């Protein structure tokens, strides 16, 4: 794993195919940027044309499988390229799964409520 520093922001590169980065605390904190600034930063520095983050509610709704009028999701599933997704965590587990054959990326915010309600199984069913 490599540490990447851009304009005093720090990231940990977990994977290069697919490209998975974790924002770390640096001189500047990526999480403190507003949505528009995050999107512009990722486009300028990483060539990503779209950025999505959700209102995480410790549930089982997954963007790409479910709909939510309030943008309340605890995960995403996509085949879309050059699209960054946020998974915000404190004491929950960020789980990222990649299906190389299907080129399907899934990211889940796994709190105890979502785990108890089967968020991982729900995401894996989509892959089948």
Cite the ranges covered by each PLM segment.
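Active-site microenvironment for binding and transforming phosphate-containing groups
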Residues: 1-128
């Amino acid at each position: 794993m490599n540490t990447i520093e851009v304009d005093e922001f720090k990231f940990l590169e977990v994977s290069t195919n697919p490209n998975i980065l974790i924002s770390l605390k640096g001189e500047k904190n990526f999480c403190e940027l507003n949505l528009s600034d995050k999107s512009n930063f990722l486009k300028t520095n990483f060539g990503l044309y779209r950025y999505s983050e959700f209102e995480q509610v410790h549930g089982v709704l997954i963007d790409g499988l479910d709909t939510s009028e309030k943008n309340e999701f605890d995960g995403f599933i996509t085949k879309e390229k050059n699209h960054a997704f946020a998974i915000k965590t404190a004491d929950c587990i960020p789980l990222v799964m990649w299906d190389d054959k299907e080129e399907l990326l899934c990211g889940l915010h796994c709190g105890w409520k979502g785990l108890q309600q089967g968020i991982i199984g729900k995401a894996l069913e989509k892959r089948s």
